[in-house]
Amino acid sequence: MVIELIAGFITNALVLIADAGHMFLDSAALGLAWWSAVLSQKGDDEKLSYGYHRMQVLAAFVNGLSLLILAIWITWESLVRLASPESILPLPTLIVGIMGLIINLVVYRWLHNSSNNLNVKSAALHVLGDLLGSFAAILASLAVLFFGWLYVDPALTMVIALILFRGAYGVLKDSIMILLDGVPPGFDLTEIKQTLKDQCRLVVDIHHVHAWSLTSNRPMLTLHAQITDSDQSIVAVKSIKAILKQEFQIDHSTIQIELEGCPDEEGSHSH
């Protein structure tokens, strides 16, 4: 990272300078990802009844925000260079770019295998930006070395910025939805209610359905179920939980059984 930054200023290659700044954020992102993953293993307590699982999501949000800020800065610098192209030293840029490409490729492949975790996914996007930065540095140096095309450096940097914008948007969108207790992607509350009424003969009505995610791969749900036979309450709860787990992969649900009428007259409803 330090070597690449120094090389960027010496060679005047924007892709190297941008990549060095991105690598600095990567170091912070990976450290934050590791710290939040360790912290999320702690059990619950009286103040945090769900434990520290959301730390992974919060870390992903911070990582996504840093990606967005970096993409904005890279875009600005690229526009300045496009308006007034500056020469670079192609050979040192090529060497540093090849070294960075190899290192970042190894790290990205390692992180990409754990992409189901939102926090690790956001960290992998940071490294992907570094990988693309190294590749862009190689192309820019070759273009200047053989053709003298000074516009290639800021142009390729702009492409990287656009890719980072897309990655930042995805991570921020997913993490914000989880932090706001939004309905998990792919969940249809109407379908859940209808499935429960169709498959559980004891159920007369399903309402007050609320679904959210504790983390990116841990959905949770609460609902009210109206039944006609109070003696079958335990059976109904077990049946509903089994259906939720089998049909929708929800293994943590809270079911409130009602005989007639709902005691909650106000609030957010899902009928």
What are the functions of these language-model segments?
Residues 21, 29-39, 43-271:
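Alpha-helical transmembrane segments and adjacent TM-loop junctions that form the membrane-embedded core
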Residues 26:
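Classical protein tyrosine phosphatase
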Residues 1-3:
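The first (N-terminal) embedded transmembrane alpha-helix
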Residues 6-17:
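Short, hydrophobic transmembrane alpha-helix segments
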